[in-house]
A protein has these predicted regions:
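Hydrophobic helical h-region of N-terminal Sec-dependent signal peptides
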Residues: 8, 12-16
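C-terminal motif of bacterial Sec signal peptides marking the signal peptidase cleavage site
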Residues: 18-21
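Lipid interaction determinants
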Residues: 23-91, 97-147
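Bacterial N-terminal signal peptides that target proteins for export
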Residues: 1-9
Length: 147
């Protein structure tokens, strides 16, 4: 009886070790990881991220922000929807690593516009974007996490 219990216990223990040892966690691709840093993971209470404008540079020259500009926020939802603190809405997508495409519908005019930003850097607390402005200069936006 004692031998039978020992064998069953060993079998159970071995099965648990095999199950735990063989379970795999599939690593995220850099593209998936970048999307999750921007907009959340879709897990409970992590379905969107709000970013607040922190600084703005043109060709490396700092442009001091007004109080209104300091309050500007962009919200990216995990499902690809976009909104901002000026009540504009739209969509976002990252199809290529480091390239953020925003399609915005402006509330005041109901017109649609698209822009592609270079994602210079992104982490859980900061988002830095570059875009070529209409005058040919480089605009650099720095955002901090707001939510």
């Amino acid at each position: 009886m004692k031998l039978k219990n020992t064998i069953l216990l060993l079998l159970l223990f071995s099965s648990i070790i095999i199950i735990i040892g063989c379970s795999k966690t599939v690593p995220k691709t850099p593209l998936e990881f970048q999307k999750e840093l921007l907009a959340g993971t879709s897990a409970y209470l992590n379905t969107q991220r709000t970013w607040q404008l922190d600084s703005f540079y043109v060709d490396g020259i700092n442009f001091p922000l007004t109080p209104l500009q300091k309050g500007y926020k962009k919200t990216f939802s995990y499902d690809g929807l976009y909104s901002d603190s000026e009540m504009n809405t739209g969509k976002w997508e990252i199809q290529t690593l480091g390239k953020l495409k925003q399609t915005i519908i402006y509330k005041t005019t109901n017109k649609q516009d698209s822009s592609v930003f270079d994602i210079v850097s992104i982490n859980a607390a900061r988002l830095n974007l570059n875009i070529k402005l209409s005058n040919g200069k480089l605009g650099s936006y720095s955002f901090k996490i707001s939510n």
